Curated annotation (Swiss-Prot):
InterPro entries: Basic_leucine-zipper_C, bZIP, bZIP_sf. This is bZIP transcription factor RISBZ1. SUPFAM superfamilies: Leucine zipper domain (SSF57959). Residues 236-299 form the bZIP domain. SMART domains: BRLZ. Transcriptional activator that binds to the DNA specific sequence 5'-TGAGTCA-3' found in seed storage protein gene promoters. Involved in the endosperm-specific regulation of storage protein genes. Can activate the expression of genes encoding for the seed storage proteins glutelin, prolamin, globulin and the allergen RAG1. Functions synergistically with DOF3/RPBF to positively regulate quantitatively many seed storage protein genes.
Length: 436
């Protein structure tokens, strides 16, 4: 099982030693001092400046002047620590473990020529350098967080972080080169990307052997791996259950839609049957309405005919009742029958002329045409046979007609009554009716 160590405790046997560099005096604050010898030590200028500032605060003696005029700082590491580091390097050399480069006791990097600098500017410069180093450390930690959050190994993101870290300046420390597994190379493998640690010189100077993984750590890592695997399995189970629930909900939704569609189809079929029955009833009603309309027209024609007949009957009744009322209005009068007769004969009321209308109602009977009289009443001048009852009756009728004409005030009425009497009945019929 592959173990993960801290960055400052990982020795890399595959790390190639850097090429030797000739010592040179530092010309400014940003120059880097180097030491020649078997162990190459590199330190960024911000680290040297910070160490110098701490030495000045602690009261370290001033640096000695070199023959070329540059100031040489004494080694900040004690002699015992340097000897222990060298012994550890010699003891583990057969294992090809490149752990800690031995710190040289002499030939330290030269300080800048312009040692006398404004303290305010110097402090501002140190603060700026410190901020840059802290930003670099924060980016390095972010790269470690990205690696821990992506268990599948996102090589693209790690390579990007590694390139960013390689482009930054080294952080403050003793300049020991450490190869990390968290920063892959450009081709995806382990590359020569360097991460510096601030307190690496203190830890590796005091440590006499490399750190061995303990069984408890192995158990912890195995437990973490099992927990991670369980988490992955739980996530897979959740995804699988979610998919199954989605399929089940979709199936239920489809079944509900199918049932709803079936109900709608049944309702449509019922509505179609009802519609057809209603259409048949409507056709029957239309047919009955047309037949009733025809019957209504026939009945209206019959009603008009009956109304005409009723009007004719009413006119006939009016004609008869009007003649009777006129006859009742004429007073009873006696007429002498003959000079030779001993007694007078009274005139009866049942005069046949009562059945005819007077002259005023003659215009109402518009459907009866007037006809000329067929006979003339026998003149009273004529000689009458007193023994003949017919002649006597005619004489009485003539006298009665004469009196009626005089009472009505005109001869036209007599002519009309004569015309009606002559058109309806003859003289014999009139006499018979009078005798009855």
């Amino acid at each position: 099982m592959e173990h993960v160590f801290a960055v400052d405790e990982i020795p890399d046997p595959l790390w190639a030693p850097p090429p030797p560099v000739q010592p040179a005096a530092a010309a400014g604050v940003d120059d880097v001092g180097a030491v020649s010898g078997g162990g190459l030590l590199e330190r960024c200028p911000s680290g040297w400046n910070l160490e110098r500032f701490l030495e000045e605060l602690d009261g370290v003696p001033a640096p000695a002047a070199s023959p070329d005029g540059a100031a040489i700082y004494p080694s900040p590491m004690p002699a015992a620590a340097a000897e222990a580091a060298a012994r550890w390097s010699r003891g583990y050399g057969d294992r090809e473990a490149v752990g800690v480069m031995p710190m040289p006791a002499a030939a330290l990097p030269a300080a800048p020529a312009s040692a006398a600098m404004d303290p305010v500017e110097y402090n501002a410069m140190l603060k700026r350098k410190l901020d840059e180093d802290l930003a670099t450390v924060a980016m390095w930690r972010a790269s470690g967080a990205i690696h821990s959050e992506s268990p599948l190994g996102n090589k693209t993101s790690l390579s990007i972080v590694g390139s960013i870290l390689s482009s930054q300046k080294c952080i403050e420390g003793n300049g020991i080169l450490v190869q990390t597994k968290l920063s892959p190379g450009p081709n995806g493998g382990s590359g020569p990307y360097v991460n510096q640690n601030t307190d690496a010189h203190a830890k590796q100077a005091t440590s006499g052997s490399s750190r061995e993984p303990s069984p408890s750590e192995d158990d912890d890592m195995e437990g973490d791996a099992e927990a991670m695997g369980n988490m992955i399995l739980d996530e897979e189970d959740k995804v699988k259950k979610r998919k199954e629930s989605n399929r089940e909900s979709a199936r239920r939704s489809r079944s509900r839609k199918a049932a709803r569609l079936k109900d709608l189809e049944e309702q449509v079929s019922l509505l179609r049957v009802e519609n057809s029955s209603l259409l048949r009833r409507l056709a029957d009603a239309n047919q009955k309405y047309s037949a009733a309309a025809i019957d209504n027209r026939v009945l209206m024609a019959d009603i008009e005919a009956l109304r005409a007949k009723v009007r004719m009957a009413e006119e006939s009744v009016k004609m008869v009742t009007g003649a009777r009322q006129l006859h009742q209005a004429i007073p009873d009068m006696q007429s002498p029958l003959n000079v030779n007769s001993d007694a007078s004969v009274p005139i009866q009321n049942n005069n046949p002329m009562n059945y005819f209308s007077n002259a005023n109602n003659a215009g109402v009977n518009s459907f009866m045409h007037q006809v000329s009289p067929a006979f003339q009443i026998v003149d009273s001048v004529e000689k009458i046979d007193p023994t003949d009852p017919v002649q006597l009756q005619q004489q009485q009728m003539a006298s009665l007609q004469h009196l009626q004409n005089r009472a009505c005030g005109g001869g036209a009425s007599s002519n009309e009554y004569t015309a009606w009497g002559s058109s309806l009945m003859d003289a014999n019929e009139l006499v018979n009716m009078e005798l009855q």
